[in-house]
């Protein structure tokens, strides 16, 4: 019996180990107008305060909505929650629509994009100033690329069965170690996510206007595409940060990770210092370090813990270890009105469970570089027949198809165990549908989207068509988890909460900033 099989049998012995898995979804999407332009209107007043609303907020731009679900222990529930908040929001947006693709279209200039506004409180100004810094550092167009983030945690029962009886401190350390093992395996094998679910094989030519690229694009009118690409969002064209490439933050232990993160937020950047901190009285970045704050760290997966008020993410991790992980490699699924579907959630359940139960040796920088090379191949060439990937750095190679099949043998074993607990075959059905995509890459989301794009005559055309369909689906939707009254009450609560925060501020913003970054001194 392999170690993987042994560990799987342990956790599967307790039905609650899988039943109580925690999941949450964050979905980003741009508001745009009837004539296919980015919305210049403020955040819809009818959905409350973007600063304090639990489920409906904004990301980088005022027009970049973000929908957030609470933690749920049921796959269908988390999707129902997302459907309900989409319905509520679209009902308050007039004729505007939600852009159904990760890559923005019809946006070519930073000036087209208004930064997200959060009111006059110090914390609201801090959030907008942080975004001003991102704009000055990387440009606004990069920042309005949309994605879906999947938050995931194993149950206490899962850890009880896997780790046995332990003191509270030992359990905290063991759980953090196990999550870092998962994260390292995610870097090794997570290219499966863009292979199946990458949804940006093409983009509007306006997106790369004035930018240099070595990619050998083919064109279709104003659309640029790579014939075998899966996720240009995850490529060098997407949101990347050259200044971060030298950070080398270790994923081998929580202490090393926190140490690396602390170093990054304290390391001055010559390049960013040239931007300056203020223009007149206006703050234009929070500081001139490599990272203004920890959230600026670009990563396809992050270890997380819910922070207490005033606590930095790394301080929360240091206090009590890893609570959950945030998967950040999902493109928006253009074929789903909510940007993600049930098969994607179930695959991530299977894959993340496999990643934590499979051996995961420590990883050095050179090994990480080899795995990143595989990701780059998949995002640019993922559907190419016979594409070979590296197995580590020893020169051994395997086709993406053969490698995916190896992993899928193990995933099927997990699917059967999960289905046995739930009394259905939902995970095996997902496994079967994705197995067909291994055999035929054109069944993947990127394969289907590129075919539709060619048929329609351009990515902008297909984006507008899907947006109209999805808007109607949202308007036709009937509440299935929340009620309208509950969401109305959350709007009122959020507006009141913002007013209370603004009324309680006592110090000028410059003083507040000095105090906030006192830990850097």
UniProtKB/Swiss-Prot annotation:
Organism classification: Bacteria, Pseudomonadati, Pseudomonadota, Gammaproteobacteria, Vibrionales
Annotated GO CC locations: cytosol
UniProt EC number: 6.3.2.2
Key word ATP-binding present: yes
Pfam families according to UniProt: Glu_cys_ligase
Protein name, UniProt field: Glutamate--cysteine ligase
Family matches, as InterPro entries: Gln_synth/guanido_kin_cat_dom, Glu_cys_ligase, Glut_cys_ligase
Organism of origin: Aliivibrio salmonicida (strain LFI1238)
Biological processes, Gene Ontology terms: glutathione biosynthetic process
Annotated metabolic or biological route of this protein: Sulfur metabolism; glutathione biosynthesis; glutathione from L-cysteine and L-glutamate: step 1/2
UniProt family annotation: Belongs to the glutamate--cysteine ligase type 1 family. Type 1 subfamily.
Listed GO MF terms: ATP binding; glutamate-cysteine ligase activity; metal ion binding
The keyword Transmembrane belongs to this UniProt entry's keyword annotation: no
Reactions performed catalytically: L-cysteine + L-glutamate + ATP = gamma-L-glutamyl-L-cysteine + ADP + phosphate + H(+)
UniProtKB keywords: ATP-binding, Glutathione biosynthesis, Ligase, Nucleotide-binding
Top EC group: ligase
């Amino acid at each position: 019996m392999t170690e993987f099989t042994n560990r799987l049998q342990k956790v599967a012995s307790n039905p609650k180990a899988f039943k109580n898995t925690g999941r949450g979804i964050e979905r980003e999407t741009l508001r745009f107008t009837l004539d296919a332009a980015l919305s210049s209107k403020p955040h819809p007043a009818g959905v409350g305060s973007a600063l304090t609303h639990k489920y409906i907020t904004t990301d980088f731009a005022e027009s970049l909505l973000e929908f957030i679900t609470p933690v749920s222990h049921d796959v269908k529930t988390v999707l129902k929650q997302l459907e309900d908040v989409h319905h509520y929001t679209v009902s308050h947006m007039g004729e505007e629509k939600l852009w159904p693709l990760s890559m923005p279209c019809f946006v070519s200039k930073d000036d087209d994009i208004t930064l997200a506004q959060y009111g006059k409180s110090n914390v609201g100004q801090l959030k907008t100033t942080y975004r001003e810094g991102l704009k000055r550092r990387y440009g606004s167009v990069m920042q309005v690329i949309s994605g879906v983030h999947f938050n995931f945690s194993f149950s206490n029962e899962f850890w009880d069965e896997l780790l046995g009886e332990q003191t509270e401190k030992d359990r905290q350390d063991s759980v953090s170690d196990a999550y870092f093992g998962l994260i390292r395996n995610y870097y090794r094998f997570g290219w499966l996510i863009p292979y199946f679910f990458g949804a940006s094989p093409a983009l509007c030519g306006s997106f790369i206007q004035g930018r240099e690229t070595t990619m050998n694009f083919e064109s279709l009118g104003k659309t640029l595409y790579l014939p075998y690409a899966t996720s240009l969002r995850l490529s060098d064209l997407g949101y990347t940060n050259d200044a971060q490439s030298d950070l080398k933050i270790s994923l081998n232990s929580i202490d090393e990770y926190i140490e690396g993160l602390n170093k990054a937020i304290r390391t001055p950047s010559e390049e960013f210092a040239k931007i300056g901190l203020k223009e007149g009285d206006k703050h234009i970045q929070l500081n001139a370090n490599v990272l203004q704050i920890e959230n600026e760290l670009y990563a396809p997966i992050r270890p997380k813990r819910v922070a207490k008020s005033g606590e930095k993410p790394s301080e929360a991790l240091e206090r009590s270890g890893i609570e959950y992980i945030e998967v950040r490699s999902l493109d928006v699924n253009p074929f789903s009105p909510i940007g993600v579907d049930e098969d994607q959630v179930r695959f991530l359940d299977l894959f993340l469970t496999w990643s934590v139960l499979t051996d995961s040796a420590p990883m050095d920088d050179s090994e990480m570089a080899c795995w990143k090379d595989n990701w780059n191949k998949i995002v640019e060439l993922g559907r190419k027949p016979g594409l070979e990937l590296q197995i580590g750095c020893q020169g051994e190679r395997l086709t993406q198809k053969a490698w995916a099949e190896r992993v899928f043998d193990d995933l099927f074993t997990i699917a059967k165990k999960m289905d046995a607990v739930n009394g259905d075959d939902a995970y095996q059905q997902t496994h079967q549908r994705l197995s067909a995509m291994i055999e035929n890459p054109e069944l993947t989301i990127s394969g289907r989207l590129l075919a539709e794009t060619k048929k329609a005559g351009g990515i902008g055309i297909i984006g507008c068509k899907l947006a109209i369909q999805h808007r109607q689906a949202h308007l036709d939707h009937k509440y299935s988890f929340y009620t309208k009254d509950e969401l109305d009450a959350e709007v009122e609560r959020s507006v009141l909460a913002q007013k209370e925060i603004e009324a309680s501020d006592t110090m000028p913003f410059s003083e507040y900033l000095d105090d906030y970054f006192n830990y850097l001194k």
